[in-house]
Regions:
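Glycine/proline-rich, positively charged
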Residues: 27, 94-130
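Noncatalytic linker/hinge segments flanking ATPase motor cores
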Residues: 46, 55-62, 88-94, 116-124
Length: 130
């Protein structure tokens, strides 16, 4: 797999990665087993870069990504600025989501909000690094 350097860093990532929006039910209801199979297939063909976000199914994508990636080598990107607060999603279709987890988004781009989002992301992923 061709690699590309990230900015001025020494980090190199695959030129092709797997995006996690469909894994969270964004625009299509991809069940857990299908999502797990998709991630595993990507790993098996040499993809090592994965991307997810709290927005993707309000945590659904992060949960399955963490479960499948745990214990393997990977590069994972996630997002901050949107915290998830427990509560029913009133109109998931308005967000382009099918069967999201029961959370609502709270926008917070402050330093504390970003750090909280990072910690929350790790918790949903069940991982110790992003």
């Amino acid at each position: 797999m061709e690699k590309r350097r990230v900015g001025q860093t020494k980090l190199e990532i695959d030129s092709l990665g797997l995006g996690g929006a469909p894994l969270g039910g964004n625009f299509v209801d991809l069940g857990y087993a299908q999502a797990e199979e998709l991630i595993q297939t990507a790993k098996n063909i040499g993809i090592g870069y994965f991307d997810t976000a709290p927005w993707y199914g309000f945590g659904r994508s992060e949960r399955v990504m963490g479960d499948v990636l745990r214990g393997s080598e990977y590069i994972l990107s996630d997002k901050v600025g949107r915290l998830l607060a427990p509560g029913p999603v009133k109109n998931p279709a308005d967000f382009g989501m099918v069967d999201p987890l029961p959370f609502n988004v709270v926008y917070d781009y402050s330093y504390d909000g970003i750090m909280r989002a990072y910690e929350d992301n790790l918790q949903r992923l069940g991982l110790d690094r992003i």
